[in-house]
């Protein structure tokens, strides 16, 4: 249904001088998709409110809604090219007016878990890379063909978006930071067997592959309304340091069916282990933490086992934040069990002593 539209968007991006890598293509597709999704969501909520005789308070001001600037329509439903911005006017509006307006939501939001805060965070962390307002106009019209109304439409969009993430992961450079092969993720989920009511966590979530696949695993069968609400609101938490990965994670979870993803833009390793309380702990942890990274000495001071290897720091964090009786599946490099350095030996001992009452798949 939407596969050709995604191909058309990619063709536009490949011809755009401001976009040169698969990471750029995914980034630009992501912010456009997000704004189209947000407009569809608001239109749906407004209609639902109208049906029960209530007024809906829009998040986005009318002048900056998708239907006003990206795809103004004629009465027959076709794009009104007489009123649609194009060329330098479109680029000027996006860079000087739209993005600053959207960035301002972060300061105006009442708390970090609101959609308003996430809007501000997303548009504070990415930028418009389109240099040609004609290319952007073409991309907008293709994006406008996409719909987020039905579960079937979201399902297809999620698969197409996952394909873009996979291409980005295979593109070299730092693309692998964003993508874990889905067969590996599904195998780990089958072993750990999360259940409805578990709180599931990934402290290095990348594109949120583990969280999305856990959602797909848990939503199978005939769930009650209460169970569906639990999945939507009280199950998944992700943390991500990289700006682009944060944006992709939110969009990926939205396309899989989580309306307000609890993805936090932060460096997990800067959190003090001694501050973690029982209420902060999780029943299930999935993660593929980055290997070979380095953290500043002051960050390493948060951990009892001092090491510059970020994967080992993440393991200590996961041990601390996993509930007693909890289960974890973590990808770790294959030399971990044979390395003879002090940090590896100490961490293996810590796993043996601290995880007797927890199940871990490493």
Where are the regions that the model predicts?
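Acceptor-substrate binding/catalytic loop of class I
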Residues: 336-340
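Short glycine-dipeptide loop
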Residues: 322-328
């Amino acid at each position: 249904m939407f596969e050709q539209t995604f191909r058309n968007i990619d063709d536009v991006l490949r011809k755009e001088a401001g976009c040169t890598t698969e990471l750029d293509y995914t980034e630009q597709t992501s912010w456009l998709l997000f704004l189209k999704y947000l407009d569809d969501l608001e239109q749906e909520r407004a209609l639902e409110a109208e049906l029960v005789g209530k007024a809906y308070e829009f998040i986005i001001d009318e002048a900056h809604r998708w239907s006003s600037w990206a795809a103004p329509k004629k009465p027959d439903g076709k794009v009104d090219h007489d009123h649609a911005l194009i060329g330098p006017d479109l680029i000027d509006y996006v860079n000087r007016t739209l993005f600053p307006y959207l960035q301002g939501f972060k300061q105006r939001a009442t708390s970090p878990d609101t959609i308003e805060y996430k809007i501000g965070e997303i548009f504070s962390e990415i930028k418009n890379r389109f240099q040609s307002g004609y290319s952007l106009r073409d991309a907008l019209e293709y994006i406008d063909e996409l719909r987020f109304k039905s579960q079937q439409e979201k399902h297809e969009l999620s698969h197409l978006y996952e394909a873009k993430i996979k291409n980005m992961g295979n593109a070299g450079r730092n693309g692998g930071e964003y993508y874990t092969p889905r067969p590996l993720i599904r195998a780990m989920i089958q072993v750990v067997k999360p259940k409805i009511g578990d709180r599931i966590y990934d402290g290095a979530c990348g594109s949120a592959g583990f969280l999305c696949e856990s959602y797909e695993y848990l939503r199978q069968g005939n769930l009650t309304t209460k169970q569906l609400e639990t999945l939507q609101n009280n199950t998944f938490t992700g943390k991500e340091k990289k700006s682009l990965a944060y944006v992709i994670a939110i969009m990926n979870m939205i396309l899989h069916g989580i309306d307000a993803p609890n993805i936090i833009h932060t460096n997990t390793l800067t959190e003090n282990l001694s501050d973690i309380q029982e209420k902060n702990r999780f029943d299930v942890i999935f993660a593929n933490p980055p290997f070979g990274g380095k953290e500043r000495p002051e960050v390493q001071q948060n951990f009892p086992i001092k090491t510059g290897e970020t994967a080992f720091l993440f393991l200590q964090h996961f041990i601390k934040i996993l509930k007693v009786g909890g289960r974890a599946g973590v990808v770790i490099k294959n030399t971990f069990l044979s390395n003879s350095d002090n940090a590896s030996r100490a961490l293996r001992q810590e796993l043996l002593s601290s995880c007797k009452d927890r199940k871990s798949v490493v």
